[in-house]
Each structure stands twice: as structure tokens, then as C-alpha cells.
Amino acid sequence: MSQVDKTARRQKIKARSRAVVRGTQERPRLCVFRSLSQIYAQLIDDESGKTLMAASSMSKENAGLTGTKSEVSAAIGKQIAEKALAQGISRVVFDRNGFRYHGRIKALADGAREAGLIF
């Protein structure tokens, strides 16, 4: 399967899931994006169209993270969960953004659950 086909397939899956998954102020959407070397997570309120908070492996505060990409993803999950709990958000809707729930996506979700997010 070529890269174009994989990207188009992921976009179709993303569109189908976004028709169902909606974030609110009380229960925002935890949206995950995975590139070849980095991972990004955002808490999004779809009602107002605003990003409430974000964490990524590219940010300055995470410049010292070392280990495998899965270990870094788990650390990003814990970090976004700690930020959310500090703002009083304990429940989220997980949006895997068309990616398979496997590897780094699963590691991020497990890290967020360990830190106290419920989804």
C-alpha cells in the first residue's frame, strides 16, 4: 500500500470518527497526532472550537525526554493528563485521529490513564 493510499485511508477513518466523537468543555476531546518521529496531544472543546491545552514531544519542556518513541509517548500522555487534572478536567473523549490503537497511540492513552484521566 503506497503512502498516498495510507494517508487517504486514515483521512476517511478520521472523518467517520469525527462525525461521532465530539468534545465539550466538561469532557473535551483528547486528539492525538503521530508523525514519524514526534507525537502531539491536544484537549479540544468542539462546541467553542478552542484548544484547551496541548503537549508534544517537540515542546521546550520535553526537550530532555529520552528513550524509545513509545516511552516518550507515554510521558506525553502523563503530561497532558496532569495538565488536564490541574484545570479540573478528569473525563475526556479519546480521538485516535484515524490511527490504529497500537504502539505509540496506545502508549499515550495508557500514560494518560495511569495519570488519572478517565476515558
From Swiss-Prot:
- One GO MF term attached to the UniProt entry: structural constituent of ribosome
Q: Does the keyword rRNA-binding apply?
A: yes
| Pfam families (alphabetical) | Ribosomal_L18p
| Any single GO BP term | translation
Q: Cellular component GO terms, alphabetically?
A: cytosolic large ribosomal subunit
State the UniProt keywords alphabetically.
Answer: Ribonucleoprotein, Ribosomal protein, RNA-binding, rRNA-binding
Establish whether keyword Ribonucleoprotein is in the entry: yes
Q: Which Gene3D superfamilies match?
A: 3.30.420.100
What InterPro entries does the record tag this protein with?
Answer: Ribosomal_uL18_bac-type, Ribosomal_uL18_bac/euk
> Which SUPFAM superfamilies does the entry link to?
Translational machinery components (SSF53137)
What does the record note on quaternary structure?
Answer: Part of the 50S ribosomal subunit; part of the 5S rRNA/L5/L18/L25 subcomplex. Contacts the 5S and 23S rRNAs.
Please give the function described in this protein's UniProt entry. This is one of the proteins that bind and probably mediate the attachment of the 5S RNA into the large ribosomal subunit, where it forms part of the central protuberance.
Similarity comment text for this entry: Belongs to the universal ribosomal protein uL18 family.
Q: What is this protein called?
A: Large ribosomal subunit protein uL18
Q: List the lineage, top down.
A: Bacteria, Pseudomonadati, Chlorobiota, Chlorobiia, Chlorobiales
Q: Which gene encodes it?
A: rplR
